[in-house]
């Protein structure tokens, strides 16, 4: 029997959160390469149930996506079953949990118990190694890729009938504080007098009640902006195709945002916050545009709204970047090589 892999994730499809999208893409790619695996979604099953099912599955390796949310159970299972543990370190892990007084001890125990630790970008690995230098030899960089494989059409007009000729700014993100969803509204409101064709689209679940309610209250008075709800990932390519500028306003990212990668792959112009995770993908003025604050957002948004040629040039450069540097095959090869160093896997 081929060596099996048990994947533990804080979220999995049909969730459209970044972790779920990443896990689904990697699991699909590894399965296509002949790696037997099963994914457990910790958001829908009790830990005791997951533990019993994983033990019955008899895996040769446990792979946890998210050190804090999935790593603790994965570490306990790896020790109980005497098998290696692989941990994929996420944005929340790197930017918050590793330094949080309450969560850091548990996160560090998980990292120290892992046979391999994967990160999406070298900068995240450097951050981990600065805190836990003994882990550097176990760190492996596996860059993310794009998995827009299902192209179901999205009837945007059914959610928000838009006139022709609009310039659609899209924020595809779960509504929570780290995504800073309120940031675009004031600058775009000021620009809407110069560019009445501007429309602002929010697409994603309302995960934080406080932020979600504040956003909906604000949108109620803005006829040019709307939250269209959660869009299934299978329809994301269609939504991107109906947008002109894709926003990422995050305060932090775990190396590479799925939303930015997908926007680049779709040939959309990207306007993103100037943070480490976004800089790993967006070369300012080449593959997208970066902003440092609300004032700079307004300047860059005006440039993009008024210059379709600029949007086209940025989109084409982004599409070429993803095709050249972030193919799906490299991501899947990376995880397969990590596994191969620990257990027998198909060539």
Residue ranges of predicted features:
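Glycosyltransferase donor-sugar binding loop
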Residues: 44, 146, 199-213, 229-230
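A short, active-site helix/loop in glycosyltransferases that binds the activated sugar's phosphate group
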Residues: 114-139, 143-149
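Conserved donor-binding/catalytic core segment of Leloir-type glycosyltransferases
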Residues: 118, 162-179, 185-192, 201-203
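A short helix/loop element that forms part of the nucleotide-sugar donor recognition site in Leloir-type
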Residues: 150-162
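Nucleotide-activated donor-binding/catalytic signature segment of Leloir-type glycosyltransferases, i.e.
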Residues: 213-234
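Short alpha-helical donor nucleotide-sugar binding micro-motif in glycosyltransferases
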Residues: 230-231, 239-243
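Short hydrophobic beta-strand element within catalytic cores of glycosyltransferases
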Residues: 269-272
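Conserved acidic donor-binding segment of nucleotide-sugar-dependent glycosyltransferases
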Residues: 283-295, 303-309
């Amino acid at each position: 029997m081929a060596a099996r892999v048990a994947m533990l994730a804080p979220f999995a499809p049909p969730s459209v959160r970044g972790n779920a999208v990443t896990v689904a893409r990697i699991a699909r790619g590894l399965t296509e390469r002949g790696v037997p695996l099963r994914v457990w979604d910790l958001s829908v099953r009790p830990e005791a149930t997951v533990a019993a099912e994983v033990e019955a599955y008899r895996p040769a390796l446990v792979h946890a996506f998210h050190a804090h949310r999935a790593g603790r159970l994965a570490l306990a299972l790896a020790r109980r079953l005497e098998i290696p543990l692989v941990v994929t370190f996420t944005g929340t892990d790197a930017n918050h949990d590793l330094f949080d007084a309450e969560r850091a001890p548990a996160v560090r125990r998980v990292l120290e118990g892992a046979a391999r630790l994967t990160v999406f970008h070298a900068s995240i690995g450097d951050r981990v190694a600065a805190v836990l230098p003994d882990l550097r030899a176990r760190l492996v960089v596996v860059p993310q890729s794009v998995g827009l494989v299902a192209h179901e059409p999205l009837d945007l007009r059914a959610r928000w009938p838009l006139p022709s000729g609009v310039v659609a700014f899209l924020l595809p993100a779960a509504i929570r504080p780290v995504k800073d969803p309120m940031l675009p509204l004031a600058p775009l409101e000021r620009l809407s007098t110069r560019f009445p064709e501007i429309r602002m689209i929010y697409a994603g679940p309302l995960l934080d009640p406080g932020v979600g309610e504040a956003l909906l209250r604000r949108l109620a008075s803005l006829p040019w902006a709307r939250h269209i709800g959660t869009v299934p990932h299978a329809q994301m390519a269609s939504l991107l195709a109906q947008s002109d500028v894709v926003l990422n306003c995050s305060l932090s990212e775990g190396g590479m945002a799925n939303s930015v990668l997908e926007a680049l792959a779709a040939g959309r112009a990207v306007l993103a916050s100037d943070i480490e995770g976004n800089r790993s993908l967006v070369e300012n003025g080449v593959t997208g545009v970066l902003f440092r604050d609300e004032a700079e957002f307004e300047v860059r948004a005006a440039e993009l709204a008024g210059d379709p040629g600029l949007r086209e040039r940025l989109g084409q450069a982004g599409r070429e970047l993803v095709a050249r540097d972030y193919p799906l095959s490299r991501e899947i090869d990376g995880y397969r090589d990590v596994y191969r160093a620990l257990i027998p896997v198909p060539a």
